């Protein structure tokens, strides 16, 4: 859990959320980031898979009428329907402090489904952040770098030291932002996206 009080306001501010916006949060934990989102957005929907956390969130988020908890697995829930039902035509930003072991699957699901979201601001392990944000053609770039660059413009915002968490992890974290493209920067031959990604992963 994040215990540094300065981190979550920076994440929420970086997401550009304000009046008229919706925020989709993945993994609210005990609600530290959630509270900052609720102070800025018209509505915040948090997806949480851990069934132990709803009682805690019910207490920590009691004063926020614009908060809704969805007890689901973000990799399985129907995100398109959820976004349409909860946010309508509001601009939506995604914010999350992602578990390191599941960073890529969650990000790629959010991007590959071409959901109506403006940006994704997440905290991940620093090494993962560097891979996700590596420019295509550089030595650091890998398949995930090319995949992310197809769907969004990534940037590394700031790093977060282990002491900002309890318990403290053994690695440094980083906050990144993916500004989702309205149209991809390249067009696959014959519009074959699946073929393009097979080539990327080869």
Set out the residue ranges of the language-model regions.
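Catalytic cores of RNA-modifying enzymes
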Residues: 1-202
């Amino acid at each position: 859990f994040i215990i540094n009080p300065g981190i979550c306001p920076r994440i929420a501010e970086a997401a550009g959320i304000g009046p008229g916006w919706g925020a989709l949060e993945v993994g609210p934990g005990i609600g530290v980031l959630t509270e900052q989102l609720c102070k800025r957005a018209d509505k915040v929907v948090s997806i949480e898979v851990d069934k132990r956390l709803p009682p805690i969130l019910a207490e920590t988020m009691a004063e926020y009428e614009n908060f809704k908890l969805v007890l689901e697995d973000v990799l399985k829930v129907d995100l398109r329907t959820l976004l349409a039902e909860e946010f309508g035509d509001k601009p939506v930003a995604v914010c999350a402090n992602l578990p390191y072991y599941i960073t890529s699957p969650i990000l790629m699901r959010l991007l590959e489904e071409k959901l109506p979201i403006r940006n994704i601001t997440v905290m991940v392990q620093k090494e993962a952040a560097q891979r996700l944000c590596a420019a295509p053609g550089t030595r650091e770039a890998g398949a995930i770098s090319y995949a992310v660059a197809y769907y969004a413009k990534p940037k590394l915002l700031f790093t977060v030291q282990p002491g900002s968490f309890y318990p403290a992890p053994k690695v440094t974290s980083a906050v990144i932002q993916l500004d989702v493209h309205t149209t991809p920067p390249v067009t696959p031959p014959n519009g074959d996206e699946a073929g393009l990604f097979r080539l990327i992963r080869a």
